[in-house]
Design a protein with these regions (language model features):
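Active-site glycine- and acidic-residue-rich loops that bind
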Residues: 25-31, 66-67
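Glycine-rich beta-alpha junction loops
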Residues: 2, 25, 53-54
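Inter-motif core of Ras-like GTPase G domains
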Residues: 5-26
């Protein structure tokens, strides 16, 4: 939340930037809006906004469906004048991989969620180079 930004800023005084992450719910977008405002006030560069859990990906057939109902996160990015980095759909395999000590992305690069993660990471890396 926005209350942690002061602490992060004191630990990393030359912060290159932050990535804001939200889910499609109105409450989450309200909270991230406060974080964006705080970062702007503190002159912390915002690399962009990621829409997390943007739908559900079936681990068997890779079809996507809605997970949350809410507002379009791209609209929030436009309103706040920050780059929209993309959306990452929820995949139940992420939790199972994490619990077993494995990395989801390494084993699932070709999945819908893996490709979405890769796309977002490429945009972040391009932004900070």
């Amino acid at each position: 939340g926005s209350d942690r930004i002061d602490n992060i800023r004191s630990l990393i005084p030359e912060l290159a930037g932050v990535v804001e992450i939200t889910i499609p719910s109105l409450l989450s977008q309200h909270i991230v809006s406060k974080s964006i405002a705080k970062n702007n006030k503190m002159k912390v560069p915002i690399i962009g906004l990621i829409e997390n859990m943007a739908g559900y990906t079936c681990p068997h057939c890779e079809k996507e469906g809605p997970l949350f109902e809410g507002e379009n996160v791209e609209i929030l990015a436009k309103q706040k004048n920050i780059p929209y980095l993309g959306k990452i759909p929820f995949d139940t395999r992420i939790g199972r991989k994490t619990d077993s000590g494995s990395l989801y992305y390494i084993d699932n690069k070709g999945s819908v969620t893996g490709k979405a993660i890769n796309s977002v990471v490429e945009k972040i890396l391009k932004s900070i180079k």
